[in-house]
Each structure stands twice: as structure tokens, then as C-alpha cells.
């Protein structure tokens, strides 16, 4: 058949598809990427967009590995660490579903739980630290020190290992994940913004003027991930809402995106409202309320006595089905500081841990915060997640797509 234009063949790239916490994403070793995608830039972004199947005007990511939600449109690049006393560098890319954008501005706390396991399985952690006990089956905990390259922070993952191999199966249950697995403890060290104040405005609570919405009380914090917290009742909600109530309401989504954009300007993350469209990953916007009974998305009944506070958070323009791991760090940190909206909704006072209700159930997370010379700081935040490999092999994409 003469006259046909020859098309570039597909290329094969080694990759691993992993769940971490309530998210899942495609993991790459930096050295396995095509050479032109081993450095930041358009080639890398275009490769990851094609892998995930974005931008997709249908919003389904049918022609890629993405799952058409913010929790499943994620990519991770791991490499031997460039930092002293760290095992790996971890770079996270949040891929937009309907726009040609990979957002590198923040971390994914859920996938962090999978980074430690991936680092061990990929040979980035010395074998001496993952001993094989031979015929004796012994599960040990291996500490993996991770440099989070997006936000320049240290994260410690404590990964269970049995006879030299990552232990993925177990009985740890995590609301938002159907099946139990092995527990991975994750510690976020000094999770507040290292380049500025934890509270960028200098206040625990601000008046945030949002055109078309009004003036809202807001706690704007940069810990784990920049987050704008507002009171649920200020925008007509009670904090027990599930996804359909928010995600099925275009007006509500537009309102929350407007709040997020004006919060981003107030926090100094962007200079103009227009920039928010290409910075979808950060900041997050969340609304809080005192505890109340509700039915989680699984049908499980959550009772007031089981939780300290209700939190609902939006990610990439949609209400999250559970809670982003980094937002959980922000929640724990804000809850530990008397006077923030999160702390007040949880009953006020000093606390080192908080159990919050989210659409899929509950989560407990701890934080150690203290005030030094009038500035609040947090030394670490701790949570438990789980992770496992879903698939490993090769990703195939057209060779001319990047």
C-alpha cells in the first residue's frame, strides 16, 4: 500500500505500577528512562503525559495507565540519592487528566509509602540492611531515608522485610483501601516549608476575601503540602459530605477552585489568579467541622466518639475519595497548634495526634509542633500506610510522543 506515512514504533520503558496508601502510580528508575527524559523538561513531561494517557478531553485516560482520578494520575521517578545520609531521591509528578500539564510543585504523601519498598526492590538500599535469614522466616523493619526532591525534605519510611524481600502482605487495614496489607510507617521530618514560615501570612487565621463567595475565615499552612483550610459551615456544608455531593455539583467545584486560587495568591504561591490553572496540585483546599456521625463511602458507620474532627479535601479540582497523605500532614500539624481552624474544630487545646473523619473512613496522624521566638515549627509528622506492587514490566508509548 504505497503512499502511507511511516509511523514511529512504540518504545519499551521498564516501569512498576504500585499502590501507596490510597493512591497508585507508575514508578520509574531514573536510569531506565530514555536519555532525553532523564533531565527535567518538555521531553520528560510529554513522556509522562503519554504514559498516563493525558490530556484526555473525555476525562477517562483510556489510552494510558491513569485511572481518571487525582489519586491514580500519578508518576514517580526514583534514583540513587544525591544527598548525604539518604538512600534515594524521590521525584513526584502529578499528571493533569484533561490538560497537558505535569505539576512538580508538591509531594504525594500516599505514594511515599511505596517509595521505600520500591527503593529496596530496585537495589537502591544496601543488601546488608535487608538480610536474608535463610530457612528462618523473620520479618524485620528496614529504615529507608528518602530525599523528597520536589520539596527538598527528608522522609523516613520503615518498610517490613522478610528474608531479604519486601513484605507486602499483612493485616494492616487502611480506610479507602479494600484489602489489608503490611504496615509501612512514614515519618515526615521538618515538613513545614523550609524557605518560609509555616504560616505564610504570619497568622493562624486570616480573613480571605473571595469574589462571589465572600470573606472566609481561613487557616493557610505550609506543612506537608500548602493547604487552605476553611470552616464547612461557612460554605454551606457540614463536613460529612461524600464525593458525589461535591463532585456532582459544578458550581461547588468552581467555588472551591476560586477559594483555592485566592488562597494561593494570599500565601504567595502565585502572583495572579490566572496562574492557578497551571498549578493544580498546590495548594489544596479543605473544609473542617466538629465531629459528627456519618456513613462512609463503604457504608461503614463513623460515630462521633471515633474521631476528633471532620475534614474533606479537594485535589486536582475534585473532592478526594479519602485523604491525600500530604494533606494529612497539614491536618495533623494544624491540629497541634492551638487557634487554627483545624484545632478549634477538633475542640481546641494542645494535642500531639488527631483522628479525623474523611469520606472513606478515619485516619490517625501525629505531629510534634512547638513555638520558638513567636514562630511555629513542626519537627515531624507520622502516619501509617501500606503499599504493594500491582504490576511490573514495561510501559510502551509511541517513540515520537516525547
Where are these regions (language model features)?
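A glycine-rich beta-to-alpha transition motif near the start of alpha/beta enzyme domains, typified by
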Residues: 2-402
Amino acid at each position: 500500500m504505497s503512499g502511507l506515512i511511516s509511523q514511529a514504533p512504540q518504545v519499551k520503558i521498564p516501569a512498576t505500577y504500585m499502590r501507596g496508601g490510597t493512591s497508585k502510580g507508575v514508578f520509574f528508575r531514573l536510569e531506565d528512562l530514555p536519555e532525553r527524559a532523564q533531565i527535567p523538561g518538555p521531553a520528560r513531561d510529554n513522556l509522562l503525559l503519554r504514559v498516563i494517557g493525558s490530556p484526555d478531553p473525555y476525562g477517562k485516560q483510556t489510552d494510558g495507565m491513569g485511572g481518571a482520578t487525582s489519586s491514580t494520575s500519578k508518576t514517580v521517578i526514583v534514583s540513587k540519592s544525591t544527598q548525604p545520609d539518604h538512600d534515594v531521591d524521590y521525584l513526584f509528578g502529578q499528571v493533569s487528566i484533561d490538560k497537558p500539564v505535569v505539576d512538580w510543585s508538591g509531594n504525594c504523601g500516599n505514594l511515599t509509602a511505596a517509595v521505600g519498598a520500591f527503593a529496596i526492590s530496585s537495589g537502591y538500599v544496601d543488601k546488608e540492611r535487608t538480610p536474608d535469614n535463610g530457612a528462618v522466616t523473620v520479618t524485620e523493619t528496614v529504615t529507608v531515608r528518602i530525599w523528597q526532591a520536589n520539596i527538598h525534605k527528608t522522609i523516613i519510611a520503615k518498610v517490613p522485610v522478610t528474608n531479604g524481600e519486601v513484605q507486602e502482605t499483612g493485616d494492616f487495614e487502611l480506610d479507602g483501601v479494600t484489602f489489608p496489607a503490611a504496615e509501612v510507617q512514614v515519618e515526615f521530618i521538618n515538613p513545614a516549608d523550609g524557605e518560609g514560615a509555616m504560616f505564610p501570612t504570619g497568622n493562624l487565621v486570616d480573613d480571605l476575601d473571595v469574589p462571589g463567595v465572600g470573606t472566609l475565615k481561613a487557616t493557610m499552612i505550609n506543612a506537608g503540602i500548602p493547604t487552605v483550610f476553611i470552616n464547612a459551615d461557612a460554605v454551606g456544608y457540614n463536613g460529612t459530605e461524600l464525593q458525589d455531593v461535591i463532585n456532582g455539583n459544578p458550581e461547588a467545584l468552581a467555588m472551591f477552585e476560586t477559594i483555592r486560587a485566592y488562597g494561593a495568591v494570599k500565601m504567595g504561591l502565585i502572583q495572579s489568579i490566572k496562574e492557578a490553572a497551571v498549578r493544580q496540585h498546590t495548594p489544596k483546599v479543605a473544609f473542617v467541622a466538629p465531629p459528627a456521625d456519618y456513613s462512609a463511602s463503604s457504608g461503614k458507620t463513623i460515630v462521633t466518639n471515633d474521631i476528633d474532627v471532620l475534614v474533606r479535601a479537594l485535589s486536582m479540582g475534585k473532592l478526594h475519595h479519602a485523604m491525600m497523605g500530604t494533606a494529612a500532614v497539614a491536618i495533623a500539624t494544624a491540629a497541634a497548634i492551638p487557634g487554627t481552624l483545624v484545632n478549634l474544630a477538633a475542640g481546641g487545646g494542645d494535642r500531639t495526634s488527631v483522628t479525623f473523619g474523611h469520606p472513606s473512613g478515619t485516619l490517625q496522624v501525629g505531629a510534634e509542633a512547638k513555638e520558638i521566638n513567636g514562630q511555629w515549627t513542626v519537627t515531624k509528622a507520622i502516619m501509617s500506610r501500606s503499599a504493594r506492587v500491582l504490576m511490573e514490566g514495561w510501559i510502551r508509548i509511541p517513540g515520537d510522543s516525547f
